[in-house]
A protein has these predicted regions:
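Beta1/beta-strand and adjacent pyrophosphate-binding region of the FAD-binding site
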Residues: 1-11
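Cofactor-binding loop segments of dinucleotide-utilizing enzymes, especially the Rossmann-like FAD-
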Residues: 10, 33-37, 171
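Redox-cofactor binding/interface segments in oxidoreductases and associated redox assembly factors
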Residues: 7-8, 95, 127, 168
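FAD-site-proximal beta/loop scaffold in flavoenzymes
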Residues: 1-2, 101-176
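A conserved FAD-binding loop/helix module that cradles the flavin
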Residues: 14-19, 24, 169-199
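Rossmann-like dinucleotide-binding cores of NAD(P)H-dependent redox enzymes
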Residues: 18-81, 200
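Flexible loop/turn segments at secondary-structure boundaries
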Residues: 13-17, 37-41, 81-83, 100-103, ...
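A conserved short coil-to-beta-strand element within the FAD-binding core of flavoproteins
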Residues: 76-89, 96-102
């Protein structure tokens, strides 16, 4: 209540944090998103039936816009520093804009834009950083097949990957989703591992 709240992450969890901060009576809410603002309409590299990667305001952003007058998200931005005051409590954060560039391995990485630093008031920071896919280096090292979205290929209900004895579940298998799916799939994958190890 009465705090400037900064949420770091632009996904579903970040949206929930925006809505919760507003309902708890925050003074202001800002949502930091390292990715670019999506286009209003589908881009040519995002055809149907793929999930549409388009700009939308979810309930949290709509509530913030109704109260503050605008979408609380700040795109292409990352946090460089947390600054404290008396007693060691958070007082502000320092943000900087980023641009995405391909590194020498062809992987898109965020690069800070010099001269774009901004100090933002913040007495509360919530980390809600999103999921951009499973860690690829380990999967490549052991030869696990992935789909076009970089998720591990493993059929729902069986969880076995392309490598014998390796199983996958949750966000790693299905992509970013709800924790209830991760719990459900974790149990299913544990049962699949048990069947594999016991030879059933």
């Amino acid at each position: 209540e009465g705090k400037d709240v900064v949420i770091i992450g632009g996904g579903d969890t970040g949206t929930d944090c925006v809505g919760t901060a507003l309902r708890q009576g925050c003074r202001s809410v800002t949502q930091i998103e390292i990715m670019a603002r999506p286009p209003v309409e589908r881009a040519s590299d995002n055809p149907w039936p793929e999930w549409p990667r388009v700009y939308k305001m979810d309930y949290g952003q709509e509530e913030a816009a109704a109260r503050q007058g605008d979408d609380p998200r700040v795109y292409l931005t990352t946090v460089r520093k947390f600054a404290g005051g008396a007693g060691g409590n958070l007082e502000s954060i320092v943000t900087v804009e980023v641009k995405w560039q391909r590194n020498d391995k062809g992987i898109a990485v965020p690069v800070e834009v010099p001269g774009t630093e901004q100090v933002r008031p913040a007495q509360l920071a919530l980390l809600a950083m999103g999921f951009l896919g499973p860690e690829q280096s380990l999967l490549k090292d052991i030869g696990v097949a992935c789909d076009a979205r970089s998720n591990v290929q493993a059929e729902y209900g069986h969880y076995a990957t392309s490598v014998k004895g390796v199983f996958s579940a949750g966000d790693c298998r299905r992509g970013q989703s709800l924790v209830v799916w991760a719990i459900n799939e974790g149990r299913g994958a544990a049962a699949a591992c048990d069947r594999f190890l016991s030879g059933k």
